[in-house]
Amino acid sequence: GYFVIFMMDGIDDMPSENEPVYITGVGTEDDGDEAEAQQMLRQNEGIYQTFTQLKADQPFIFMSTVEGRKCYYYVDDNGVLRERNDGEDYTVTVPQSGIYRITINMGEQTISYDEIGAVYLFNKSGDYRQNFNYLGYGKWGVKNYTARKQTESWAGSGETRHSFKMEINGTTYRWGHKEKDKGQPNLTTDNSYYNLYQLALGTDPWDYSFRFCDELLQWGEKQGNVYYATVKTDVTLYFNAEFGTYTHRWVASETNED
């Protein structure tokens, strides 16, 4: 007798840890120039994520170089992530232009899309928000920003706790610190302090917050119940692979020298 082994058409060329995966194509921010392709953040073995802007009905593809060979990955009509064979030109499209968070799982051959709306800095104190602009390639930011902190009964010198908010599929999520109640940073604090973690819905709005760096911002005199920074800053959120993790940075704006 004989038996037949049926195998699912899996992905043969799985990129290793040091073989980056990119999103590229006319539908992406690189306009089809693979040299400008956006690298995805590797979250785990076979799992990659990117925040990026896509154009409706324009093709894109996932790409990696595995053991020296250029490999492309697409999504078939059943929503299954597959590897393109030589000579094939399958691509992927989305029906609506927008900014998306895309997650692919090569082991399970799945893809998910989340639509991203407003992104902003949020101070629970005073319920103050500062909207951020999308800068491209998974970055959001604001330039020449004057930080503010408001006095509270428990914080006479101003409450510096803040986090970042992001609308994902119409629901607002907070991104905050890894620790529930982390102290204030200074100019020599390790950059890992600024790494961003998506918090569960319903998390206490004060917990897992960042705190302002007084050494950088140089607070002025109190005006009413608010202190304003005398040093303007450029604040950038990196929802990309640039630092190997989602993170953010505050730097003094060039305009301060005027």
Spans of features found by a protein language model:
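Insoluble glucan recognition modules
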Residues: 1-258
